[in-house]
Regions:
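Short glycine-/polar-rich loops that comprise or flank the Walker A/P-loop
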Residues: 34, 74, 95-98
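Phosphate-interacting basic helix/loop segments used at nucleotide- and nucleic-acid interfaces
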Residues: 184-194, 201-202, 384-390, 396
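Short, charged/polar surface micro-motifs in flexible loops or helix N-caps
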Residues: 44, 82-86, 106-107
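Non-catalytic interaction surface on structured domains
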Residues: 191-292, 297-301, 312-313, 408
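Accessory RNA 3′-end/elbow-binding domains used by RNA modification enzymes
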Residues: 1-42, 47-69, 120, 129-166, ...
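Acidic, low-complexity central loop/insert segments
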Residues: 90-199
Length: 430
């Protein structure tokens, strides 16, 4: 039996379709009848919009995706077509990696930038939070105010204004020592409360079903939505950058620009702007993890609220956004007049490759299962037995893809029946 490591382990290299040597005079590659497209979803369209674009490009109806991405999110969306749609339930269970920006100091109804602003709490809580001990190290009083003994940084209480925001003597800005305290607290809370095996309450505006109805539909109708906590695993939660500045309360979802780009982040141009902290993170986690909920919970633990303003999925199992097989897409806006005479607009997704180029980037059925589960090489007689629903004499663990090594044909998905035997779970036509 030949096997490959399961993609959900997070250690497998990105899946790349095998390339055949070019043959002089050969025809252009035909799009396989079954396989996967790894699409880099753009912001502003739904996952279903990507599926619709794939249906049009592939000229087939049997198309689906493995794991919804919100309209504001970008990144890896694995799209299956033909027989490979039977793999999607397996792919969706793989570990994933995300890059995101969490905005601390503002909370929203949906825990992301698409919701309505609920609160902007950093100014009112500023002095109180600086007085709190930093997890992981005792805090003692210094000459100029509180000192984190573990980190050795001091904060001058005299430089904290009446509204709670911190200023330099000649320029409105967050004090460098305040910034270090915040970074320390963010790191400590992530390490102590948001990493490892944890209980997470999903977001109210989520696709989870309650008595047959989506939670987000109930929430939009004003219903009280109560979701139970779920056990998830966050294997890595790293902070890439922390930026301090001001954001208008009426304008959500615009990340602070790093000072390294030559634009100041600490000037208050708008009287309605409030202090915020933008935290860029990279998270690797199990299936079922809500990155919006991690942002919400980080803000709650700090006592200032938080929401997600940027989300990009960079990996699903062994399918990585850096793979040469990734297909990009763009957004087009369609203007139209509805039956009531009202002017409307709607975004749609368009794949950036079609025809021969699409065929070259599509993963075949064998490439698809190789990135999804272990492989099991079988004989022609084994294939006959599987197609008649019979067991075959192989000792496997979990689910594997049975294939014919000579032709590369994937015959069935098989699972352990008893010691030394495997039984067909899903059989594909010859």
């Amino acid at each position: 039996m030949g096997t490959v490591p399961e993609a959900s382990g997070g250690e497998q290299a990105p899946i790349v379709a095998a390339e055949a040597a070019p043959v002089a005079g050969s025809a252009a590659p035909a799009t396989p009848t079954s396989g996967l497209l790894v699409v880099d979803k753009p912001r502003g369209v739904t996952s279903h919009d990507i599926v619709a674009a794939a249906r049009g490009a592939l000229h087939m109806k049997k198309v689906g995706h493995a794991g919804t991405l919100d309209p504001m999110a970008t990144g890896v969306l694995v799209v299956g077509f033909g027989n490979a749609t039977r793999l999607l339930n397996h792919i969706v269970e793989h570990d994933k990696t995300y890059e995101a920006t969490i905005r601390l100091g503002q909370s929203t109804t949906t825990d992301d930038a698409d919701g309505e602003l609920l609160s902007a709490t950093l100014p009112e809580r500023w002095q109180e939070l600086l007085a709190l001990p930093v997890a992981g190290g005792p805090q003692s009083a210094g000459e100029n105010g509180p000192v984190n003994a573990a980190k050795g940084s001091a904060v001058s209480a005299a430089k904290v204004a009446d509204d709670g925001s911190a200023y330099h003597p000649h320029q409105e800005a967050f004090l460098p020592d305040c910034q270090q305290l915040w970074r320390d607290r963010i790191d400590d809370i992530i390490a102590l409360q948001l990493t490892g095996s944890i209980e997470q309450v999903p977001n109210t505006f989520s696709a989870i079903k309650i008595n047959g109805q989506r939670a987000y539909d109930l929430a939009r109708d004003g219903k009280d939505v109560q979701l139970k906590a779920r056990r998830i695993t966050v294997s890595a939660f790293g902070v890439l950058d922390v930026r301090f500045g001001y954001a208008p309360t009426r304008q959500l979802g615009l990340p602070l620009v790093s000072a390294a780009d030559g634009l100041a982040t600490t000037e208050r141009d708008d009287a309605e702007a409030t202090p915020v902290i933008d935290v860029d993170v990279r998270v690797s986690c199990s299936a079922g993890t809500y990155i919006r909920a991690l942002g919400r919970d980080l803000g709650a633990a700090l006592g200032v609220g938080g929401h997600l303003i940027r989300l990009r999925r960079t990996r699903v199992g062994g399918f990585d956004v850096s793979s040469p097989n990734v297909i990009t897409a763009h957004v087009e806006t369609r203007e139209y007049t509805d039956r009531n005479g009202n002017h409307q607009s709607r975004n749609r997704a368009v794949l950036d490759v079609i025809g021969d180029e699409l065929a070259g980037k599509a993963l075949t059925m064998l490439d698809a299962v190789r990135g999804t589960m272990p492989l099991l090489a079988i004989t022609d007689q084994d294939a006959v037995n599987l197609r008649y629903g019979r067991r075959i004499p192989y000792d496997i663990h979990g689910t594997a893809a049975a294939y014919l090594p000579q032709s590369g044909e994937v015959v069935a998905l098989v699972e352990r029946a008893k010691r030394g035997e495997a039984k067909p779970a899903t059989v594909f036509g010859a």
